[in-house]
Amino acid sequence: MSPEIALNRISPMLSPFISSVVRNGKVGLDATNCLRITDLKSGCTSLTPGPNCDRFKLHIPYAGESLKWDIIFNAQYPELPPDFIFGEDAEFLPDPSALHNLASWNPSDPECLLLVVKELVQQYHQFQCSRLRESSRLMFEYQTLLEEPQYGENMEIYAGKKNNWTGEFSARFLLKLPVDFSNIPTYLLKDVNEDPGEDVALLSVSFEDTEATQVYPKLYLSPRIEHALGGSSALHIPAFPGGGCLIDYVPQVCHLLTNKVQYVIQGYHKRREYIAAFLSHFGTGVVEYDAEGFTKLTLLLMWKDFCFLVHIDLPLFFPRDQPTLTFQSVYHFTNSGQLYSQAQKNYPYSPRWDGNEMAKRAKAYFKTFVPQFQEAAFANGKL
């Protein structure tokens, strides 16, 4: 159900509270998921004119789970705070004295419900952390992370239900990784969606038993960061080592991700240097180039009255990954009506060369390769 449809069914006096929750409500580490409501119902009599829904189920993203809490207002007394039912978490009994925004409920503040939900989620986190005491191993993992502020202050924990047969229970740690994304080139962060939210990397680590014999890590990147780093398949985190600890494993993943970000930033500056060198060496032979991301360059060149194009595609992780050179005849066509072309990646190249050296080496390579390309174009293409 879309937020607008849901809000149209809410009692008008309660609508500001719920609007603040579904339109602006982001609670916890997962900035890509908003709060949402379902199961709208009314406690009013059938004679009460609508819209009159005053109770609903609130879905809250937390540690990879979706908490489902019932929130019950009374449309007849909209100035009163709501009641809460915590669904499957019957053992969760929040401390009323710590719910300051509930105790001092201000019906004139549209955000008062959202503020109470945030306080409840904080207490829910403490409740989940306390459940780890049943496992010395999981408690060790938690306490060692807690000693590091960069991890301890950005962590959510969900302890699963006990297995009735074994007495074991699972646990999931969700951590917001302290990786700086601020220097990623802006062109890579565009056009993902209209409201991308915070740029964030979350590491989820699931312990399927209390002795950590089955541990499954997974990395989640916000949409813009995933796009900037080359897509979901571009980054593979290592398996959790047997006998390993989170306090050792999490920094490894941070280091891996930081290096990936640095590769992207370095690639952008190196591509710009590369294209600047080609502009200098080939001058009027440059037909066009990508002036934003510096990922493409096209040259129009001549060798003994034979004109040809060279399309240069620079990869995201340049200079580590070698550019592709595509030679294209301006005279000859394939059977499908396309200009005859050949792509080359087997040419002299070193990622250690600067842009000027790469341009000089490319110019020398063009002179050696063009004769055989011309011969192939005449042999395989059609005028």
UniProtKB/Swiss-Prot annotation:
Localization in the cell: Cytoplasm; Nucleus
Primary subcellular site in the record, as a coarse category: cytoplasm
GO cellular component term of the entry, any: BRCA1-A complex
Region entry UEV-like 2, spans: 275-364
Residues with N-acetylmethionine modification: 1
Keyword terms: Acetylation, Apoptosis, Cell cycle, Cell division, Chromatin regulator, Cytoplasm, DNA damage, DNA repair, Mitosis, Nucleus, Phosphoprotein, Repeat, Ubl conjugation pathway
Pfam families in alphabetical order: BRE (PF06113)
GO biological process per UniProt: apoptotic process; cell division; chromatin organization; double-strand break repair; mitotic G2 DNA damage checkpoint signaling; positive regulation of DNA repair; response to ionizing radiation
Residues covered by region (UEV-like 1): 30-147
Phosphoserine modifications at: 2
Keyword DNA repair attached: yes
InterPro entries, per the entry: BRE (IPR010358)
GO molecular function, one term: polyubiquitin modification-dependent protein binding
Function according to Swiss-Prot or TrEMBL: Component of the BRCA1-A complex, a complex that specifically recognizes 'Lys-63'-linked ubiquitinated histones H2A and H2AX at DNA lesions sites, leading to target the BRCA1-BARD1 heterodimer to sites of DNA damage at double-strand breaks (DSBs). The BRCA1-A complex also possesses deubiquitinase activity that specifically removes 'Lys-63'-linked ubiquitin on histones H2A and H2AX.
Comment block on domains: Contains 2 ubiquitin-conjugating enzyme family-like (UEV-like) regions. These regions lack the critical Cys residues required for ubiquitination but retain the ability to bind ubiquitin.
Family note: Belongs to the BABAM2 family.
Subunit (UniProt): Component of the ARISC complex, at least composed of UIMC1/RAP80, ABRAXAS1, BRCC3/BRCC36, BABAM2 and BABAM1/NBA1. Component of the BRCA1-A complex, at least composed of BRCA1, BARD1, UIMC1/RAP80, ABRAXAS1, BRCC3/BRCC36, BABAM2 and BABAM1/NBA1. In the BRCA1-A complex, interacts directly with ABRAXAS1, BRCC3/BRCC36 and BABAM1/NBA1. Binds polyubiquitin. Component of the BRISC complex, at least composed of ABRAXAS2, BRCC3/BRCC36, BABAM2 and BABAM1/NBA1. Identified in a complex with SHMT2 and the other subunits of the BRISC complex.
PANTHER family, per database record: BRISC AND BRCA1-A COMPLEX MEMBER 2
Protein name: BRISC and BRCA1-A complex member 2
Species per Swiss-Prot/TrEMBL record: Mesocricetus auratus (Golden hamster)
Gene: Babam2
